[in-house]
């Protein structure tokens, strides 16, 4: 739950038993788990929240297959459109590393509007991604290619998208 006192906000969560990072699960991640990520992110954004640092340590799956979006310390309680777009780009890049660009785009397409998808393309650049995600991309030697593949797929899906970095 979340509570406010004066100018402070307190967020209390459950301990997640058997949590495994979405990145560690890789191909084991099913479409339901991907859909849970996008659904949780949309609910947070609708409530005015932005996460700010979506990486492998903040997206975990418990023993029952339930996805948890953790580590909201870098988040915003009165988020801007830009910070919400950053969240979307971070989530898309993270899921692409875990399950591949095609499945990541398919999952995002099931939950996001065409306008939201189009807004992600220019945000897909290394500087927008959390350090941990950039490091994983670098270790795989895939940094620029993964981001370019995602931008290309978004432009193909939403031809009005501007894929040039913002």
Q: Which sequence ranges carry the predicted segments?
A:
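Short beta-strand micro-motifs within the conserved protein kinase catalytic domain, predominantly
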Residues: 1-8
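Conserved hydrophobic "DFG−1" position in protein kinase catalytic cores
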Residues: 15, 60-61
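Regulatory N- and C-terminal appendages and interdomain linkers associated
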Residues: 120, 126-166
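Short pocket-lining segment of the protein kinase catalytic domain that shapes the ATP-binding cleft
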Residues: 11-19
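Conserved catalytic motifs of the protein kinase core domain
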Residues: 8-9, 65
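C-lobe/activation-segment region of protein kinase-like
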Residues: 51, 62-64, 68-134
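Short small-residue beta-strand/loop micro-motif enriched in glycine and branched aliphatics
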Residues: 19-25, 77-78
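Conserved kinase catalytic-core helix
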Residues: 22-57, 67
